[in-house]
Amino acid sequence: MKFGPVPLARAEGAILAHATQAGARRIKKGTRLGEDEIAALREAGIAEVAAAVLDPGDLDENEAARRIAAALKSRGVEVRDAATGRVNLHAGKAGVFCVDRALIDAINAVDPAITVATLNDHVRVEPGRMVATVKIIPFAVAGTLVDAVEAIAARGAVFGVHPFTARRVALIQTSLPGTKPSVLDKTVKTMRARLEPSGSAIAFERRTPHDEASLARAL
């Protein structure tokens, strides 16, 4: 990729480095310049633009991010659309996010132009939570770098969301003579809230005196 001033006559296909006002039209940073954009710039009296010109074999930031995200995609993870060189990946279900840190470190060591960030290992996630993001720093990268990342990702599951399995739960509470029923009621409420993210529920609850014989009978 070559970056710098580019005459309009050679700017078609280049990636605009800065947002540029062309008459009544504002052309956004990162736009791949086509015939319409070139015409608008020329009509506005602009002779050259700051832009990135891709070399043969280069991939623009969005295509590179899409390919890497596709290589990383695994069970329980959904890939969102690419924009400004970034693709976010989100949990498709509630569960536990697991990541192979060694593989992530290897990917991030390929080149500073390519970064992948994730949540920590063994984090509980809900559906829709962002678990990872792929970011291409420059406007384009060499396709060989993306090939290298794909090769690392092919070594094994880089990350994924292991969905919870819903369970029916029995809750047995013991109480001392001075224990208030409201305290036990609060415990039930708290337990239900903890079980809800996994789709689990309290099937039945039993309360018994706080002694070994009573607890044994309850069990």
Where on the chain are the PLM-derived regions?
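Glycine-rich phosphate/diphosphate-binding loop of Rossmann-like nucleotide-binding domains
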Residues: 155-210, 214
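Short, low-complexity N-terminal leaders and the immediately following helix N-cap/first helix
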Residues: 1-84
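Extended, charged alpha/beta regions that create polyanion-binding interfaces
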Residues: 55-164
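Short, glycine/charged-enriched secondary-structure capping and boundary segments
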Residues: 41, 147-148, 184-187
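Amphipathic coiled-coil/heptad-repeat helices and related helical stalk/stem segments
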Residues: 34, 214-215
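A conditional alpha-helix N-cap/helix-loop micro-motif detector
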Residues: 31, 109-114, 208-212
